[in-house]
From Swiss-Prot:
GO terms for cellular component: acetolactate synthase complex; chloroplast. This is Acetolactate synthase large subunit. Dimer of large and small chains. Its cofactor is Mg(2+); thiamine diphosphate. InterPro entries: Acetolactate_synth_lsu, AHAS_TPP, DHS-like_NAD/FAD-binding_dom, THDP-binding, Thiamin_PyroP_enz_cen_dom, Thiamin_PyroP_enz_TPP-bd_dom, TPP-bd_CS, TPP_enz. Keywords: Amino-acid biosynthesis, Branched-chain amino acid biosynthesis, Chloroplast, FAD, Flavoprotein, Magnesium, Metal-binding, Plastid, Thiamine pyrophosphate, Transferase. PROSITE patterns: TPP_ENZYMES. FAD binds at residues 163, 271-292, 314-333. Mg(2+) binds at D455, N482. Pathway: Amino-acid biosynthesis; L-isoleucine biosynthesis; L-isoleucine from 2-oxobutanoate: step 1/4; Amino-acid biosynthesis; L-valine biosynthesis; L-valine from pyruvate: step 1/4. It catalyses: 2 pyruvate + H(+) = (2S)-2-acetolactate + CO2. Binds 1 Mg(2+) ion per subunit. Binds 1 thiamine pyrophosphate per subunit.
């Protein structure tokens, strides 16, 4: 419960802030102190002493934003981060933008120079309100401490309602210090008419969608992150069980449906499975749930699902029809919409199983002809082999990733549950993985959290090893170390005449094992298959943090790949069907 009961008494703006966020259920804050935010940190001291909230000290404010982001993705709650004014606030920007494009509800609270100094170019003054306007749902500058509790209540409401996203509250230093007669605004007691999602479903659209599903002989569910946010995994499972509709997901939708199921085709798009991309190209009905038809999914847009009618369901009316005009557009919560459609299907539109069986058999032939590929056994290790082995040892783990080849391989080969896949999808933020692992581990202290990173991405935020060491967070860090900016090199090889401009990462590269050990973190270097399995097992079983520097084959490319401007059916690097699999590879199921 809050430090003080709801009484009229003289309190500071800093007290009002902390009291308000605790009333909203916040248990953890990620942040870094500084001059303008010191009044809030000074007040925080008493709240931590009373065990009412815990602050996690990061080593860079970007890490605070990513940790809050991951905390939110894995729990469904609002993640909170603190930073001071000026460079502290601007260091949050990449993290806020990451949360914005992936629809993650985080609350960023920044210090600001005193009210009298705003606009004077004072020391560490930056217009963070203006800077962040394009990447937040809403921004506030608290000009009167009496508004603090209301602003916090509104911020939490805005973060979570409709399409989730970040909100920023900028707090001038003297607002945190000023005393006033404090009354709290209870959580949820807000009135923001312009921030109300559409909740009444239109029966006509539901009826049209149900009819289209029954009449389809080759339907496909295309599921994005909105379905994860909606907690719709159970109702989607019921729909698939009833109508036997195959499922493909975006990077953000990964985990929404059992990835071991025969009906799961994995990820679609640029590095999706061949059979998912063929299914999209051949389906006659595409049911898009919480997905936004972005370019990495669609490839050449006018050839994406070009034989299909489209049902598009999304909580955000701005997304429906933005890139692809649907035959049926439904604005609403994915779980609620699917529930309505399923109820109507069960009562009025029974399935025709012979149609769906034929479609599933066709997909299964693609699955057999064009499997995901893993290099044949050799003394060296490949990224795919490491990921398959890791997944077998830690089937219920939370996985965070950075961005690049290792992210795409992880999406292909790791099989995860909903909210156990934590990755920067829309913005593609290198450096996300390590601080995201901190956020996930803080949120789930008794679960295994594994950060899959690349040697280039890891160096973006490797200072957060200090945070992991300070709090002894038992994060397992697996670095896929190929001595390149791997995805950049792959594109330079494929599209830029093998001119490898500034993508080699050997000179100046750290010894990751020694680096981790300098922070007091157990670490191993893996450079062959003989010690890979045992090192992975030790890392998973060890009660503290562990780093594994996995020195993999250098020139491995991530396939399949859809080249820019090509349709999803035009993939590079898939097995040729007449040979079953490529000569240097084996099916990952072997």
């Amino acid at each position: 419960m809050p430090l003080k009961q709801r009484v009229s008494s003289e309190k500071t703006g800093a007290f009002a802030l902390l009291d308000s966020i605790v009333r909203h259920g916040v248990k953890h804050i990620f942040g870094y102190p500084g001059g303008a935010i010191l009044p809030i940190y000074d007040e925080l001291y008493a709240w931590e002493e009373a065990s009412l909230i815990k602050h996690i000290l990061v080593r860079h404010e970007q890490g605070a934003a990513h940790a809050a982001d991951s905390y939110s993705r894995s729990t469904g709650e609002v993640g909170v981060c603190f930073a001071t004014s000026g460079p502290g606030a601007t260091n949050l920007v990449s993290g806020i933008a990451t949360a914005h494009i992936d629809s993650v509800p985080i609350l960023a609270i920044t210090g600001q120079v005193g009210r009298a100094f705003i606009g004077t170019d004072a020391f560490q003054e930056v217009d963070i309100f203006g800077i962040t306007l394009p990447i937040v749902k809403h921004s506030y500058v608290v000009r009167d401490p009496r508004d603090m509790s209301r602003i916090v209540a509104e911020a939490f409401f805005i973060c979570k309602h409709g399409r989730p996203g970040p909100v920023l509250i900028d707090v001038p230093k003297d607002v945190g210090l000023e005393k006033f007669n404090y009354f709290s605004v209870e959580p949820g007691k807000v009135n923001i008419p312009g921030c109300r999602p559409i909740t009444s479903l239109k029966s006509r659209q539901i009826l049209m969608a149900a009819k289209m599903i029954q009449q389809s002989s080759q339907p496909l569910l295309y599921i994005g992150g909105g379905a994860i946010i909606s907690d719709s995994h159970q109702i989607i499972k019921e729909l698939v069980d009833f109508y036997k509709i195959p499922v493909t997901t975006t990077l953000m939708g990964k985990g929404i449906f059992n990835e071991d199921s025969d009906y799961c085709l994995g990820m679609l798009g640029m590095h999706g499975t061949a059979y998912a991309n063929f299914a999209v190209s051949e389906c006659d009905l595409l049911i898009a749930l919480g997905a936004r038809f972005d370019d990495r999914v669609t490839g050449k847009l006018d050839e994406f699902a070009c034989n299909a009618q489209v049902i598009h369901v999304d909580i955000d009316p701005a997304e429906v029809g933005k890139n692809r005009i649907p035959q049926v557009a439904i604005v609403g919560d994915v779980a609620e919409v699917v529930s309505e459609i399923l109820n109507l299907l069960k009562t009025s539109f029974p399935p025709y199983p012979e149609q769906i069986i034929s479609w599933q058999e066709r997909i299964n032939r693609w699955r057999q002809q064009y499997p995901l590929l893993v290099p044949r056994k050799s003394t060296s290790i490949s990224p795919q082999v490491i990921l398959v082995a890791t997944n077998k040892l830690a089937q219920n783990a939370y996985f965070t990733t950075d961005v690049g080849q290792h992210q795409m391989w992880s999406a292909q080969f790791l099989k995860v549950k909903a909210k156990h896949w934590l990755s920067s999808a829309g913005l593609g933020t290198m450096g996300y993985g390590l601080p995201a692992a901190i956020g996930a581990q803080v949120a789930h202290p008794n679960d295994v959290v594994i950060c899959i990173s690349g040697d280039s991405s890891f160096q973006m935020n490797m200072q957060e090893l200090g945070t992991i060491a300070q709090y002894q967070l038992p994060v397992k860090i697996i670095i896929i170390n190929n001595r390149w900016q791997g995805m950049v090199r792959q594109w330079q090889q494929a599209f830029y005449g093998e001119r490898y401009s500034h993508s080699r990462m050997t000179e100046g590269a750290p010894d990751f094992q020694k680096l981790a050990e300098a922070f007091g973190i157990k670490a191993f270097t893996i450079n062959n298959r003989q010690n890979m399995q045992s090192a992975l097992q030790v890392a998973i079983d060890y009660p503290g943090p562990v780093l594994l520097d996995c020195q993999v084959t250098e020139n491995e490319n991530c396939y399949p790949m859809v080249a820019p401007g090509k349709s999803n059916a035009q993939m590079i690097g898939i097995a040729k069907p007449q040979r079953g699999t490529a000569s240097n590879y084996i099916n990952n199921s072997v």
